[in-house]
Amino acid sequence: GILELLKELKAHDIKIALASASKNGPLLLDKMEITSYFDAIVDPASLAAGKPAPDIFLAAAKAVNIDIKEAIGIEDAAAGVAAIKASGALPVGVGTAEELGSDIALVPDTSHLSLSYLESVWKGN
């Protein structure tokens, strides 16, 4: 699942930012013991607009000092996918086409996410 992906991305020095609208995000990361994998965690309370506005993804890219057009956003909600698209990042959905749309790369769950998968999505973009 997600832990394997985080480890793989870290091993390749790929920047990771969390752009969750959940105010419990940092607490959940601590409970899952994965906070250390993230280079930045965006506080949704610091933003003018929530998803589907792109603000949180733009802030995440800025926090890790990358151009948003060089970013992939992974999302499990339609509003989040819309926000990723609006930001200029490349969306990857976790869920179904009925939930998230058929015009993006989709995986049924996080166990299907890997660096090689994300690279193939990026190259196909």
Task: Give residue ranges: language-model regions.
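Asp-based, Mg2+/Mn2+-dependent phosphohydrolase catalytic module
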Residues: 3, 7, 23-125
